[in-house]
Amino acid sequence: MSHNLFASTQNREISASLVLSRCTPSNLKQKPASESHSIQLHQILFIDESIADYKTLAEGALPGIEVIILNPAQNAIEQITQLLAQRQRLNSLHLVTHGKPASLDFSTGSLNQTTIPHYAPQLKKWAASLAPQAEILLYGCNVAQGEIGETFVRHLSQLTGATIAAAKTPVGNSNLGGTWNLAYQTRNINTALPFNTCVLQTYPGILPTLDWSVLNLA
């Protein structure tokens, strides 16, 4: 993917602030991951902090969805597993991260065909926190592209016990070739997109492969 989401930081911040001012109510505040919740929410939106304008997506989440920004200093799969251990009967999980065919690329590393055997014991634990017929939606570019991508998604579905949807194309801004359509589904998905319409229409980026070389220089 030729688009570098780590370039022009100042322009991204200005763009994000404009989107937020248009798309979110003035009294909406994101809750930190450490804050306890007295009311059990049944959908969780996990966002990797490496995503360009991640705050735009976090603030644009629909009401009733718990938003968790993954800590870039801690393994992403371990974070998700630890948090899910504190939840029950979740209907939907949304994972927003970079992607490529058969790979979810977090700032701390990738979940792919090579690493999935290592993470399999943790992924199996997710099932205990999910409701029957729960769904997991993966927002990463091209994760389900090709046979290798579809096989990867089916493997995740088998490990977690959830129906999974993933993209076969870039995810995000249509002007950059993106879409919010998760075209590959292990079964029919009933969960709606977790973001308000304004954010879906104005989010300025896409979610391609994480540029490790740029990230390591930051």
Q: Where are the language model's segments positioned?
A:
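N-terminal acidic, proline/glycine-rich, low-complexity intrinsically disordered segments
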Residues: 1-13, 19
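A domain-level signal for caspase-like cysteine endopeptidase catalytic cores
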Residues: 2, 19, 24, 28-77, ...
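Short, solvent-exposed loop/edge segments of extracellular or virion-exposed proteins
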Residues: 214-218
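Short glycine-enriched loops at secondary-structure junctions
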Residues: 49-51, 96-99
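Caspase-like cysteine protease fold
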Residues: 166-211
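Catalytic cores of nucleophile-dependent amide-cleaving enzymes
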Residues: 92-96, 103-175
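Short, basic/hydrophobic alpha-helical segments
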Residues: 27-33, 77-91, 120-132
